[in-house]
């Protein structure tokens, strides 16, 4: 049985968010194919996540023991490390993703939990795990230097040791004349197909 962490980073509501229409379809199909797996949904806008403050540094760099697992910040890092698979649903905002997702990543990027420092340099601790990033974008950004959200996620997840990463991108949603519903449906089809083997 696998533990799946479904990370949602969009201020829009369920029925409004084009990203969530695709990611929720992915999750539903995944459940059908993996009924025994545990799926934990983490809606970042409903969590008590904020930008790190000076007082938080002691918690991040303090001891990593049983007591620290209840720490208001470290609990996210432990939860992230405990998962086997990750579904990250976040739209492109201003060439990246919503700031709350970066704030969350700062919570989970903790030495001794998701990676460690060695004499040879940092080493990821989350090997043999997999992730999918589901993103809706207003324009076409495949292989574009302007696309920094997916590239950053691939880099930071790789830093944690997660190398098996897929992306489902729904592009050109804000281009005049584009059939948005059709684009979203194409994204849902891709999501359903990938969910069957994720």
UniProtKB/Swiss-Prot annotation:
Its cofactor is FMN. It is an enzyme of class 1 (oxidoreductase). Its EC number is 1.6.5.-, 1.7.1.17. GO terms for molecular function: electron transfer activity; FMN binding; oxidoreductase activity, acting on NAD(P)H as acceptor; oxidoreductase activity, acting on NAD(P)H, quinone or similar compound as acceptor. Keywords: Flavoprotein, FMN, NAD, Oxidoreductase. Gene3D superfamilies: 3.40.50.360. It comes from the Bacteria. FMN binds at residues 92-95, 136-139. Binds 1 FMN per subunit. It catalyses: 2 a quinone + NADH + H(+) = 2 a 1,4-benzosemiquinone + NAD(+); N,N-dimethyl-1,4-phenylenediamine + anthranilate + 2 NAD(+) = 2-(4-dimethylaminophenyl)diazenylbenzoate + 2 NADH + 2 H(+). InterPro entries: Flavodoxin_fold, Flavoprotein-like_sf, FMN-dep_NADH:Q_OxRdtase_AzoR1, NADH:quinone_OxRdtase_FMN_depd. Homodimer. Belongs to the azoreductase type 1 family. Quinone reductase that provides resistance to thiol-specific stress caused by electrophilic quinones. Also exhibits azoreductase activity. Catalyzes the reductive cleavage of the azo bond in aromatic azo compounds to the corresponding amines. This is FMN-dependent NADH:quinone oxidoreductase. It comes from Clostridium perfringens (strain ATCC 13124 / DSM 756 / JCM 1290 / NCIMB 6125 / NCTC 8237 / Type A). The lineage of its organism: Bacteria, Bacillati, Bacillota, Clostridia, Eubacteriales.
